[in-house]
């Protein structure tokens, strides 16, 4: 039994060796290659995730930088406005003493010009105010004239309304009369036409009766003559037979 077992094991080993020789790759090598492939796939997956995260981070960083750049000009503009704001106020006091100095140097001529200019300004202000009362007076005069005209025209309008009311009444009366006359005339005409139409019908009927009688009278002699002729012919025929 032991000999058989040994022999069979040797045969199995020989078969495996032959397969390895044919393939050229050992099972250990296959397992190692598979493990390396799996590790490589994991590494590639991890690297891809890292790359995606880096891209997202880069995009977020770019957006943040853009926002910061946008905010920076706004802040600069605000600072510039704030910086420019006090400058006119600072310049005003500086110009004030200079103006005073120049006023002192020029002395009376400018003051005299101002004195001459004030009356002109006062007259100009009074001039536009002056036309206002005239316009008010004109408006009041127009309203008064309109009211007077309305009061003057009121009696004449009443007088015109009275004849206008009477005229429609007078116009209605003839219209009613003409309507009644128009309604009566057709009835009278129909009655006259019927009265005139009846006698001719009687005359026609009587003439027709007379014609019938005459026709009967005319036909009777003819019939009697025909009968006589027929009888004479019959007699002649009888005589011939006899």
Swiss-Prot record:
Protein name (Swiss-Prot/TrEMBL): Neuromodulin
Modified residues (Phosphothreonine): 185
GO biological process, alphabetically ordered: axon choice point recognition; axon regeneration; regulation of growth; tissue regeneration
Keywords recorded for this protein, A-Z: Calmodulin-binding, Cell membrane, Cell projection, Cytoplasm, Developmental protein, Differentiation, Growth regulation, Lipoprotein, Membrane, Neurogenesis, Palmitate, Phosphoprotein, Synapse
Main location group: membrane
Gene assigned in the entry: GAP43
Subcellular location: Cell membrane; Cell projection, Growth cone membrane; Synapse; Cell projection, Filopodium membrane
Start-end of Polar residues biased regions: 142-157
Segments forming domain IQ: 31-60
Any one GO cellular component localisation term in the record: perikaryon
């Amino acid at each position: 039994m032991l000999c058989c077992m040994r022999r069979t094991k040797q045969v199995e080993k020989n078969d495996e060796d032959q397969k390895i020789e044919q393939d050229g790759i050992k099972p250990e090598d296959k397992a190692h290659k598979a493990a390396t492939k799996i590790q490589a796939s994991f590494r590639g997956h991890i690297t891809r995730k890292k790359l995606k995260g880096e891209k997202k981070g880069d995009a977020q960083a770019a957006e943040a930088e853009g926002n910061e750049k946008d905010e920076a000009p706004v802040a600069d503009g605000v600072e510039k406005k704030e910086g420019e704001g006090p400058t006119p106020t600072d310049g005003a006091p500086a110009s004030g003493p200079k103006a005073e100095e120049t006023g002192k140097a020029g002395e009376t001529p400018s003051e005299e010009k101002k004195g001459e200019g004030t009356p002109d300004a006062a007259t100009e202000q009074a001039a536009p105010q002056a036309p206002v009362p005239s316009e008010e007076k004109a408006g009041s005069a127009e309203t008064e004239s309109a009211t007077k005209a309305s009061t003057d025209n009121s009696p004449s309008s009443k007088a015109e309304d009275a004849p206008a009311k009477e005229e429609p009444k007078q116009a209605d009366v003839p219209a009613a009369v003409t309507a009644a006359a128009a309604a009566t005339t057709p009835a009278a005409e129909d009655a006259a036409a019927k009265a005139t139409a009846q006698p001719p019908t009687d005359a026609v009927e009587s003439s027709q009766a007379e014609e019938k009688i005459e026709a009967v009278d005319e036909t009777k002699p003819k019939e009697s003559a025909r009968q006589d002729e027929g009888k004479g012919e019959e007699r002649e025929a009888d005589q011939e037979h006899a």
